[in-house]
């Protein structure tokens, strides 16, 4: 490249920089790209079992929620509130169940419960009482699990969530949940939830 060509190239580059400088100055200094990336990451489920938590006996630790809401309903002209619970379809096989998954070593039990509920059911809210602990054996792997369940009062329901393409979710009555929930230990967790909430409602009503 001749000296004249180099000089012309540098001159043109300088002109381009001078032209673009005011444009860049007018661009807001907010961190747009990280915010967009964060939204994408939030739609991805954790995979693998490298961080999976096991107890001293080698039992896999699993945690989940009974997500619920109060729904207004009119009966004989009287408006009341009834409890509905949220079920999700099984990822493999048929049936409906409550959201649950592995409790990992880098999170608390409560954090795991909220994370799994967002990943599988696309809802979040206020985590309430622990409903109990159940031991069950996995049908696929014949591994014993310790399953913990919490009540979760739903405050936010997302249109898009990590497992939306793999699962369906459905709000159902307590009676329907008793019929369609496929796991025996989750049905027991549901009964614990019903006993807890019915007693609380009775106390509030003075009965």
UniProtKB/Swiss-Prot annotation:
It comes from the Eukaryota. It holds the Pfam family NUDIX. Expressed in roots, stems and leaves. Mg(2+) binds at residues 116, 120. CDD domains: NUDIX_DIPP2_like_Nudt4. It catalyses: ADP-D-ribose + H2O = D-ribose 5-phosphate + AMP + 2 H(+); NAD(+) + H2O = beta-nicotinamide D-ribonucleotide + AMP + 2 H(+); NADH + H2O = reduced beta-nicotinamide D-ribonucleotide + AMP + 2 H(+). Keywords: Hydrolase, Magnesium, Manganese, Metal-binding, NAD. GO terms for molecular function: ADP-ribose diphosphatase activity; metal ion binding; NAD+ diphosphatase activity; NADH pyrophosphatase activity. Residues 58-194 form the Nudix hydrolase domain. It is an enzyme of class 3 (hydrolase). Gene3D superfamilies: Nucleoside Triphosphate Pyrophosphohydrolase (3.90.79.10). One of its GO terms (cellular component) is cytosol. A motif (Nudix box) lies at residues 101-122. Its EC number is 3.6.1.-, 3.6.1.13, 3.6.1.22. InterPro entries: DDP-like_NUDIX (IPR047198), NUDIX_hydrolase-like_dom_sf (IPR015797), NUDIX_hydrolase_CS (IPR020084), NUDIX_hydrolase_dom (IPR000086). One of its GO terms (biological process) is cellular response to hypoxia. Probably mediates the hydrolysis of some nucleoside diphosphate derivatives. In vitro, it can use both NADH and ADP-ribose as substrates; however the relevance of such substrates in vivo is unclear. This is Nudix hydrolase 4. The gene is NUDT4.
């Amino acid at each position: 490249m001749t000296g004249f060509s180099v000089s012309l190239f540098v001159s043109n580059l300088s002109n381009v920089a001078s032209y673009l400088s005011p444009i860049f100055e007018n661009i807001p200094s907010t961190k747009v790209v990280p915010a967009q990336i964060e939204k994408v990451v939030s739609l991805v489920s954790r995979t693998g079992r490298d961080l999976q938590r096991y107890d001293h006996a080698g039992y896999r630790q699993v945690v989940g929620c009974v997500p619920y809401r109060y729904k207004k309903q009119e009966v004989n002209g009287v408006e009341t509130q009834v409890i509905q619970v949220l079920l999700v379809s099984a990822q493999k096989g048929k049936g409906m169940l409550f959201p649950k998954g592995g409790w990992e070593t880098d999170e608390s039990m409560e954090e795991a419960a909220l994370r799994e509920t967002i990943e599988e059911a696309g809802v979040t809210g206020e985590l309430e009482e622990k409903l109990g602990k159940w031991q069950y054996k996995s049908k696929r792997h014949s591994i014993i699990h310790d399953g913990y369940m919490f009540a979760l009062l739903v405050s936010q329901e997302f249109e898009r969530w990590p497992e939306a393409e793999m699962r369906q979710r459905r709000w159902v009555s307590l009676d329907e949940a008793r019929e369609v929930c496929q796991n025996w230990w989750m049905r027991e967790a549901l009964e614990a939830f019903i006993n807890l909430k019915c007693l609380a409602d009775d106390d509030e009503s003075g009965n």
